[in-house]
Amino acid sequence: MPVIAAKILVGFVVGVLIGMTGVGGGVLMLPVLIFGLGYSPIVAVGSDALFQFFTKIPAGLLHLKNGTVRRKVVLALALGSIPGSFAGVKLLIYIRLLYGNGVNTFIKLAVGVLLIVIPTMLLLQKNIEERIANRAPTMKGFAGMAVIGLTVGFIVGLTSVGSGSIIMMLLLLFYSFPPKINVGTDVVHAVVLFGVTGWLQFRAGNVDPRLVVALLIGSIPGGLLGSHLATRVPMLWLRRMLCVLLLITGARMLWPA
């Protein structure tokens, strides 16, 4: 199969899985780029960040139109996540300057940890939602949201992973927003965060523009198909199987054979 066709196919398959399960693009895309297409982890991270920026724009606009976005929350998160992302990308540049290709080992370890943590969170999400339903928020104000943004921005700057899963879980735990508002607010914030992160990664030379274009060509129809199939397949079991696969992938990154 020609290389360009393989990249488009990867974008299509990941788009279908995202559309069907709602599992974030970073945790699905990065392992395929690294293990499947053979990209260095640092280029995979940078390219994935820019890819996610473009893929989240349509959903963000739709949520704004539907009124499912807390704009003040987006602002508070962004006040933390933008400097956090800047710090994360700068740390990658610094590690590469000191250790050369050792930065790729560092990224694999960081992504491996996230591929253990995030699927575990997703598997437990339903139980957590049921336990805290109708509970009063345990945190209030911009400061707490900005800290959440700072933490997630730093992680995304390092790995391009975790924007959706981690922010949604933290908003759920500490602010008790309705799920629909959580999703809309997270998606619009992700547009801002990945826009900044993608630009920083591009400036650092960590983006393969041709890869990003090929992935987008495949992911757009893939996402539409996945959304169409979401009501026609046993999504709960598919999501669980996907989480188990991600856990195995994370273990492989942490403990390679």
Regions found by a protein language model. Give the residues of each.
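Interfacial segments of multi-pass membrane proteins
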Residues: 29-43, 166-181
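Transmembrane alpha-helix interface/packing and boundary motifs in multi-pass membrane proteins
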Residues: 11-22, 150-160
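Juxtamembrane transmembrane-helix termini in multi-pass membrane transport proteins
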Residues: 24-74
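Alpha-helical transmembrane segments of multipass membrane proteins
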Residues: 15-16, 32, 36, 60-61, ...
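Juxtamembrane transmembrane-helix boundary motif
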Residues: 1-10, 35, 65-152, 203-257
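Transmembrane helix-bundle signature of multi-pass membrane transporters/permeases
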Residues: 45-53, 78-82, 186-191, 219-220, ...
